[in-house]
Amino acid sequence: GFVDYDESLEAALEREIQEELRVTLGPWRYVFSYPNRYEYEGILYKTIDAFFLTELYEKPAVIASDDVADTVWIDIQEIDLTRIAFVSIRNAVKHLQGGADAR
């Protein structure tokens, strides 16, 4: 999702997680950002994607909502990067998987 006008990254993160998964998580820790390009209605927007982490001690019950069709729990090392649409998210997952050339 996007950060609304006059909204902090942290507030947008909490709002988007609630809208998309119907769950409240946190506390969050900012880890890094990656540039991205997002095309909408024929216009190419340059954006910055911010990535945060939180620790889970148990799997919360999530409900796929809004733009989410389904959810699954998967080990980060098992994520198939070719199935991720946005370059910025592929780079972030690769970085978290420990890829040396991810940044």
Language-model-detected regions and their locations in the chain:
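Nudix hydrolase/Nudix homology domain
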Residues: 61-103
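Residues at secondary-structure transition points
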Residues: 3-8, 43, 68, 84
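Conserved Nudix-box catalytic region and its N-terminal flanking loop in Nudix hydrolases
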Residues: 1-20
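Active-site-adjacent beta-strand/loop module that shapes the phosphate/pyrophosphate-binding cleft
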Residues: 34-60
